[in-house]
Amino acid sequence: MVSIRLSRGGSKKRPFYHLTVTDSRKSRDGRFIERVGFFNPVARGQEERLRVESERLNYWLSQGAQCSERVAKLIKDAAAAA
């Protein structure tokens, strides 16, 4: 099954996450199909906190990809803010 979930990057005590489309059997930070955005939980000042390529996200959702709970919440919050 294809899923849309967060993949962790960044450094110690300063996380950064990519929204990735991946096979659900792969590891969290392993091989992915496509990156469709990012989430920076520790963004300060003018730094961008969340970016989602909505066109690609909608494409993958139409193909049957399942969002993780956290990604679904982020998408919902981004839609409300826009």
Curated annotation (Swiss-Prot):
Pfam families: Ribosomal_S16. One of its GO terms (biological process) is translation. Keywords: Ribonucleoprotein, Ribosomal protein. GO terms for cellular component: cytoplasm; small ribosomal subunit. It comes from the Bacteria. One of its GO terms (molecular function) is structural constituent of ribosome. Belongs to the bacterial ribosomal protein bS16 family. This is Small ribosomal subunit protein bS16. It comes from Saccharophagus degradans (strain 2-40 / ATCC 43961 / DSM 17024).
